Amino acid sequence: LAPRHPQRGEAVAALAVSRGLGVARRSQGQVPGPGCDVHVADTTGEMASWYAMAGVTVIGGTFGTLGGHTPFEPAAQGSAIVHGPDVANFAEAFAALDRAGGAVAVPDARALAGALA
């Protein structure tokens, strides 16, 4: 899980822990292992590597009213994309990726869970 702003890593990790999940934080040098449910990638300059390792990327900011974040970076690294309905900031790019099969739009969290299962 990569927060848009790495300084939010501690808060993101705390939220995951509060939900009973095991967490490792990249910024703290923690390595995911047994019992780690969430790896918080709260560093800068490594997103291309994370996308290259990810078979699927869920684009944040598309499940609320933020307009979504760029799909170009994960697409360039060959990571399939799942996104929510609010893609206003990159509407043409998401539409092209959806048509080409490089991205899948889902309407809500329940459908997201189904798409990732």
Regions found by a protein language model. Give the residues of each.
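Nucleotide-activated sugar donor-binding and catalytic core shared by glycosyltransferases
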Residues: L1-A117
